[in-house]
């Protein structure tokens, strides 16, 4: 039997190579900077210096960028270099104001000159960040990534695209595009377009002046609704598409007429208090920037205000008049130019123009649980008919429209990023905000019943940690000359509101947890409630849910980890508890927590500095040498005093996501040991089942474990015990060993789901699936170091190719990558950038004589690192291998260098788990079911090849000579029929005959010819009960 051959590079990539060592590209970049962008001499020198430092990376990665051509790779690299020097060079040193104003280099200018669109730029930017990171760090300091703001820019761009579409939809719901009374509608269309543009520019002014730092999706939506209210009362009535007398949209009325703001809040799930504050700020902008005189609407007589309740409304008499509209547009344009001239970001005005080349087709979300959670393809898999049915929402949603047409009979609306965010924000507003901002009496009883009263400690910790996550800055700190002085005040109000929401949620869930733990341990919860890590994890989780609700741009996960001093492995210990103990948590937030756990398991816990390595070094001592050599151990957790000092020091101006200094060794506090080694868990079997509640892949993994123990769950405090402490559950294990076993079981389950998805896409046999899964498990247990600093999908992809080669399948790496791109969790950097430490690779059999660390493509990783390490395992899996003969890991294979290291009595390699199918959606009998055609582009993502036969698509008949409408009618008749499916059998009816077992057996015998059983076993009739 032959070993798996190394893959040929030419069958996986285009045969295009760089014809020089980068010198010609450097010359072309110089010409591009001078001729296309007209850079000044200083900026041009900075750009050329950075290009010179990174040109070797361009040469090495041409084939992995875009379509693999030199031209496209260069255009992307040029844009990355220029964007970097714009964002980093100016922040790295003090530059005179006149020098800044002369640069005029914006991302839009860069992209247009490079002939790239926004989607292309953000698709390839992460690869540049990974490859050029060390160089950028040397040139611009260790916090270069925070200064670059690439993730924030990406999330902001996604939000703007969503908001522009949302604004267009709501605008068209209230205003017509043509006038039926005018023969030539071209001028009318232009006028409406100007009103539409005016609203967007006023919204951007609101973002710049009032929402300065925290441009979250919920706040921006409130801003758009406030702009809509201004347009409704100012745009001439002849352009309205609604009739205020019969429109179902204006449901809030008083004796004085329609309450406009209350009706809009009811329509779009916004807070009336927040909307009134925002519209007041918008009115101030109109007065200050456009120099319009505000008037009380109650004192104005105009057609636009008829039948509206005018109390609390402000009116500007000539705001939308034909004579003043062009000048108002010009003033708003100039104000935006002045306020955003030097930030180097995108020109947000372009989002109003869908035909702009920069908005060319392409997904801004990079195929995963994307930035800020805006686009989650996995949600479509778990809920193809995802609808908003929150019990907090009114019984009838007046915002239910089809193609902009109001429908009072439709109780649900299809979920969009904006509607989902607003519904989730309503939960915070109505369920969490009314709670007290201090521990409840019940929680106080638990806190005071500890060995000492820790109430003041809990309150102080919460204040410090939440201040670190939601920092405030002094009034006027971020105000620019000529801007309104309300921006910073708005930031502080926003931060204070978010702190309160997170604090109240923390106290609420903590009280519920204590109540549940007390049932297991009694009332003495000292060990849990005095654990510093536990409380920080709870606060971080509370804050993350608040951030996820508001869809913030400037504090993207894992910002909460950095600011609280915990690691991804720490946070994973409380995710399940939040889902379990906060029963009112909206579905979207449950999914968010599940998606976080997926991210933690797939890559974050494997990164350098993860506390998982501290537990792994205790559980698997043979791996400690490699862990220490690579410097993977987590630093001790920072003290509260250190965090508090950082807050005070940073009050003069806090960057969006500051990098916390490396922790220094600290003494133990609150029972938390000085050692950073991760806490672990007890009661191994029960906890494995309990932890599976928060599955890695949202709802699909909620039932992965077949263990349904009836025992009480283990106490939560055991999850935060010292790693070296013996496991009270017995078996001679330490808590670290138990915790790592539970962690590995989660990794295996996540791997099983992803392997199954790839097998479906590639249409491979079940035997291949079993072999890939078996290899993945063996690598995790015997060659754990292959996962260090890597993404688990990188190992899975290599497993597929290795098994394909050993099984002599005609499957190329190109095919594997092509199908992986269609997976919901796909990120291009997974197969483009794999971490390699060459000293480790040489010890594992690599023939490369390189030194140091770098990131290479996955094919090079397969050839140089993966195959030399796992050849023995592949031989066992191949035909005639030892896997089928012995499924216990041989202890004789253990080495002292940390590889093939396994504890005595290693677990058996389990067969592929039984993954549950997608459960059907439960629909209330009082609601209709709405269906729409499924586009072919989405069908591939939702339905695998082997399961397409299970689905009936709208437009295809399920019976001969039937139309789709008749099929749907038949379905409705069955759902709504009054026939009882279940009921008692009537044995009293004289016409009912009893059928004996022998009669059934004889019938089956006759139908099958000679045997009633396919297996040849005789039928055994049951004897009647006596």
Curated annotation (Swiss-Prot):
Region (Domain A): 416-616
InterPro entries the record matches: Cyclin-like_sf, RB_A, RB_B, RB_fam, RB_N
Main location: nucleus
Positions of the UniProt region annotated as Disordered: 656-680, 1007-1026
A biological process from GO: cell differentiation
Pfam families recorded: DUF3452, RB_A, RB_B
Localization per record: Nucleus
Region (Spacer) residue spans: 617-737
Record-linked SMART domains: DUF3452, RB_A
Family: Belongs to the retinoblastoma protein (RB) family.
Name by which UniProt lists this protein: Retinoblastoma-related protein 1
Gene: RBR1
